[in-house]
């Protein structure tokens, strides 16, 4: 490693003037002091000095003959790099040029970059730091306040760049980014005024002709580049004019060829019209098939919407009857509770009644005993007072009266009991008969209600079938002129809406449908079996994607507002039919469904293959033959099922009979279908009228049963009340005690002893009278017993009424539960039908989307087609035959059309190119005139500025001079007179001494600086060949004066001379290089020049 070069500013205390310079120093001392005085007041703060784009430092490693130079720091204004020959001054300048992107020729130091790598080393590195401070900084948020440019040069001459930020992070490695930074800072590496190398300085110094000076001026001001651009543009313009002339000749041949092709093309006008019509028919055919699928889809969708709306009604009905059941059960529970309470009251009252009855009978017996005793004693007393005859007669009369009274009362009571028992037996039998009648009436009522509901449901189904047949009849009648009407009255409107949406770009692929409209049968007899096989797919649409499906659903919602909407099948569209040769059934005698259909659209065929596997289903007209084929020992391979001409589906182990009797969509005989539908509708109307008559008869029977049931229940209640009254009366009669007859013997004995016991009886009468009064009071319980009996009767009646109410509530609960179950079953069946319908609608919608997508592939814009697909198919076939006949006579139409369009396009393109080139040439002439004028004005302006600055700099030295520009001959002559202008005439620079000529050259170069924009200037050995006097003047000129006048730019001067004559100043920075190492080779010394 070589010793690092020292960097220091010049200290005037250590400077020693050479002896030969003492005289010049003394003569110029006053001038130098004045310069210092002028400079000192004008020293500005560092913030006023431009810091953007100036060189902050440079470092060289293994560059040229130096192992390590630097880092060298530079000031922001005037910099002198001072050093002896071989110290590395020119290496610094060369490294600056190379690091900023200059090539080897720009350095005048070699022909290749690999020559700059030090001998024995594999690469060289040059690193330059540019200041990036100020409002004009380049991307300060990325690079910071400095931009570091590292360039690595390999031994092979390959160089790489690294642009780093202030912190050392690598920002870019592209030369384009370096060029962008240089353009941003306006750093012109190849401009000799920006960087004047030693060789260029020597060449300019020794040049004696005015052409070289003029060329230097042009290159320094970049006018030479502008001139070269003008020359290049003019030459390019001449080439362009020549090419335009050549193209014009070629254009004539192209026009001739185009006219020939046009004549042949016009002869195909009739064929073109047929082709146009054929394409239009194909488009109509595609959308006609879509319309048929839409007609099938819309009724399904409408039916689904209406069924969904009806679901709420079913829910409301179920909830309503649930609430009624709860209310009825509440009433039933309340009636049960009340009945239990009444039963308990009856039980309590009956027990009380029995107790009261027993007590009353006992007290009545006591009362009668007391009264008998009183009367007996009174009679005894009266009898005692009468004579015996009268007493005997009285006893006889009394005995006879008792005998007669007792027998009549008992006989009457027994007869009444027999009557009551007979009446009770009749009432019991009658009550049983009424109960059986009530049960019979209730059973008839329930049976009639169930039959009525069944007939109403049957009538509702018939009415729906009639409405569907009526819509289908309307569609079929409309389909006489338009087959699409079979799929629904609103199907043409739906297809029109699909066409309109497709024109607006709402569909990615036009949906296809109805699928049944897009297929045709090879054998019309198979229409019923194929239609039953395809089921809802006949009316379905198919779409390519779910976005198209949503658009199609919205269109169906708007257009198909009634009836069921077709299903939509969403499946990706393919331009070719699926290859089903491996899995398809192939029978020698019977076709598959796929083979029996004519399908032009591959999307429709693929949809039917994917959804129904029509390649695996056979069509066998004879039902018996179909069973033999399918249910034999060897059924056909890949065959899943077979259909007979009647629509029966036969599997290998079972078969199903079809309910449908005729084809509704695929049949060609529309009139027969219309007649069949009318007959079917008449039959359904007769059935509906018969069912309505039955419903009315059932309503009448229900009403009569209700009246009979009500009357019978009322009669039963009345009979029960009568039975209860008779039972109470019978109980009372059976409980009556017969009065006991008095013993006449005792009476006679008492009579005989009457006299003896007269006194005793007198006392006994008083005692018995008192006791009888007491018994009378006690017998007053009898009204209470009667009241209690009435209460029992009333409670019993209430019990009967509650039983009747309970029976009503039981019937009401049963009725509500029956209705709840009925509506629950209807709702479940309705939900199942909705789910099935949703699946069908989804399938049909998918089919519709696929149909629309397939139609959009043929015609992106939806068309309103009023013709049937069958008629369109016939016309397409006819046109194809006619076109084939025309092509045989005229040749290949496509080839003729292709050649015509190619000739037309070639001719039009060439004509447009020539027109554009002519317009460009005219515009170029106009712009060139404007630019040439601006170039002349700029050249005159820059020449004037250069003269001014040159005269000013010569005057500072006391020289006079003249600078003459001859722009016409491209020469520049400079005349300089060392003395005053009034003392001597101007001389050519060739007459000057070497020092004066070198000084004048420096003045010329410095005069170009103000008119050349760049953040820094660099001169290599600017004072070469100067004597000491001119060198000191040049130093002051370049140092002090430049520090004053060029304070916004960075100036770098390279010189081997001492800068001791310069005063110390903050704007002047001197970099002192170390002396070269002793023993350095001659080649190392020669790198610095003389």
Curated annotation (Swiss-Prot):
Q: Where is the composition biased (Acidic residues)?
A: 21-34
* Basic and acidic residues: compositionally biased ranges: 8-20
Could you give one GO CC term from the UniProt record? Smc5-Smc6 complex
Where is this protein localized, as stated in its record? Nucleus; Chromosome; Chromosome, Telomere
Coiled-coil positions: 242-479, 668-858, 894-919
Keyword check for Membrane, yes or no: no
Superkingdom of the source species = Eukaryota
Region Flexible hinge: list its residue ranges: 480-667
Region (Disordered), start-end ranges: 1-44
The family database entries (InterPro entries) matched by this protein are listed as:
P-loop_NTPase, RecF/RecN/SMC_N
Q: Which residues bind ATP?
A: 83-90
The signal peptide here is none
Key words of the record? ATP-binding, Chromosome, Coiled coil, DNA damage, DNA recombination, DNA repair, Nucleotide-binding, Nucleus, Telomere
Q: What is its main location?
A: nucleus
Q: Which GO terms describe its molecular function?
A: ATP binding; damaged DNA binding; single-stranded DNA binding
Its biological purpose is as follows: Core component of the SMC5-SMC6 complex, a complex involved in repair of DNA double-strand breaks by homologous recombination. The complex may promote sister chromatid homologous recombination by recruiting the SMC1-SMC3 cohesin complex to double-strand breaks. The complex is required for telomere maintenance via recombination and mediates sumoylation of shelterin complex (telosome) components.
Please describe the quaternary structure of this protein: Forms a heterodimer with smc5. Component of the SMC5-SMC6 complex which consists at least of smc5, smc6, nsmce2, nsmce1 and nsmce4a.
- Which family would the database say this protein is a member of? Belongs to the SMC family. SMC6 subfamily.
- UniProt protein name: Structural maintenance of chromosomes protein 6
From which source organism is this entry?
Answer: Takifugu rubripes
Q: What gene is this protein translated from? A: smc6
